């Protein structure tokens, strides 16, 4: 199948604390994407610094790491046709004020510093992020019974 890919999605501490985990998972499942891995954890500062290494020179970096370390996160890997691009569209803009209603951030967020969810921005970054958060044996390969109803 063309463009079958995987993406990394993380529900941030504010999304967990606000009880939005089920709603977010529901949206990805209803779209037709397949969950292949999931963890509930409190990421260490060191792990978060690795994850956000491309932002290390930005003035908001220390606050971002502190915020992400402030509580548990739900780390997930989703698979599907064009899941990276479509997943980003489902999330909405990084700044919730620029997000359209119907997107996760458009429906549930107000400020950029509390935007409840992270999603890989490219296939390359998805591969990097997935390998940072999950071991290969933690990625479960299976065929969903809904597969033939979602894909031609």
Curated annotation (Swiss-Prot):
Its main location: cytoplasm. Residues 1-66 are annotated as: Interaction with AKAP13. It is found in: Cytoplasm; Cell projection, Lamellipodium; Cell projection, Ruffle; Nucleus. CDD domains: NDPk_I. InterPro entries: NDK-like_dom (IPR034907), NDK-like_dom_sf (IPR036850), Nucleoside_diP_kinase (IPR001564), Nucleoside_diP_kinase_AS (IPR023005). NCBIfam families: PRK00668.1. Hexamer of two different chains: A and B (A6, A5B, A4B2, A3B3, A2B4, AB5, B6). Interacts with CAPN8. Interacts with AKAP13. Interacts with ITGB1BP1 (via C-terminal domain region). Interacts with BCL2L10. ATP binds at residues 12, 60, 88, 94, 105, 115. GO terms for cellular component: cell periphery; cytoplasm; lamellipodium; nucleus; ruffle. It comes from the Eukaryota. Keywords: ATP-binding, Cell projection, Cytoplasm, DNA-binding, Kinase, Magnesium, Metal-binding, Nucleotide metabolism, Nucleotide-binding, Nucleus, Transcription, Transcription regulation, Transferase. Pfam families: NDK. Belongs to the NDK family. The active site is at 118 (pros-phosphohistidine intermediate). This is Nucleoside diphosphate kinase B. Disulfide bonds: none annotated. HAMAP family: NDP_kinase. One of its GO terms (biological process) is CTP biosynthetic process. GO terms for molecular function: ATP binding; DNA binding; G-quadruplex DNA binding; GDP binding; identical protein binding; metal ion binding; nucleoside diphosphate kinase activity; protein histidine kinase activity. The keyword Transcription applies. Its cofactor is Mg(2+). The keyword Transmembrane does not apply. Its EC number is 2.7.4.6, 2.7.13.3. The gene is NME2.
């Amino acid at each position: 199948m063309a463009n079958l890919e995987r993406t990394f999605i993380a529900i941030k501490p504010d999304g967990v604390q606000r009880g939005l985990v089920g709603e977010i998972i529901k949206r990805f499942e209803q779209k037709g994407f397949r969950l292949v891995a999931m963890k509930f954890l409190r990421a260490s500062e060191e792990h978060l610094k690795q994850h956000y290494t491309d932002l290390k020179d930005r003035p908001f970096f220390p606050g971002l790491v502190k915020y992400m370390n402030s509580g548990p996160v739900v780390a997930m890997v989703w698979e599907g046709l064009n899941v990276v691009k479509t997943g980003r569209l489902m999330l909405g803009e990084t700044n919730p004020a620029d997000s359209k209603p119907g997107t996760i951030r458009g429906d549930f967020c107000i400020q950029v510093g509390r935007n409840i969810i992270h999603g890989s921005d490219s296939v390359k970054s998805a591969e990097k992020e997935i390998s940072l958060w999950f071991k290969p044996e933690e990625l479960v390969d299976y065929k969903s019974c809904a597969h033939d109803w979602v894909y031609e």
